[in-house]
Amino acid sequence: SSAASDVYKRQHDFLRKGKKSPETVHPGLWRQGQLNAIHGLFEVTEGVWQARGYDISNITFIETSNGWLIIDPLTTSSTAAACLALANNVLGERPVHTIIYTHSHIDHLGGILGVTTQEEVDAGNIRIIAPAGFLEEVVKENIIAGPIMARRAHYQFGPLLPASPQGQVDIGLGQSFPLGASHLIPPQKQSTKQDQN
């Protein structure tokens, strides 16, 4: 694991000690924090793996005959790259050939440069697929509503508080927001309901 992920994990060590929730934390949030503290690479079913606990969403790796199909490359390139390295180290090195964005939330697309490059996509080595209307939704959510949502998140999740039972405990989706750069490579294909038939 990287030094950055080690620091991230150590900040929330107070949740890993199996203690009951202190008076300063709602028991439901404490339990959610303990569950979010469980991180690693998990087999969902044969050939399908998820890295959990490294970001506020999960990244899915599907083994195919010609490499990885990745679903939702997380929030930042650093967390996505760490999870791809984890999958390759544990399961064997495989090239990435397809990436699917399931929807327009930044925690499902922002880490794209951790699993591929614009050059790989431009060369036709990687396909990126998203739902119909995806780019419009990305603009609506991240450019139009983004500043308001970012401001609200400071009140909602307490990211400026120190990680402790008296400060920032968990944000529900994960331990805390990952730090790092988020990017977007537009999909070459936006699927419709018709494509699924």
Language-model features: where?
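Short, small-residue-biased leader/transition segments that mark boundaries at the very start
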Residues: 3-8
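Long, low-complexity, polar/charged, intrinsically disordered or flexibly structured peripheral segments
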Residues: 9-35
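Short, solvent-exposed secondary-structure boundary motifs
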Residues: 29-33, 49-53, 178-188
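Conserved beta-strand hairpin/beta-sheet module of binuclear metal-dependent hydrolase folds
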Residues: 34-94
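Metallo-beta-lactamase
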Residues: 43, 129, 135-197
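Short helix/loop capping segments that flank catalytic or ligand/cofactor-binding pockets
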Residues: 60, 79, 110, 137-139
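Active-site metal-binding motif and surrounding structural segment of the metallo-beta-lactamase
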Residues: 66-67, 77-129
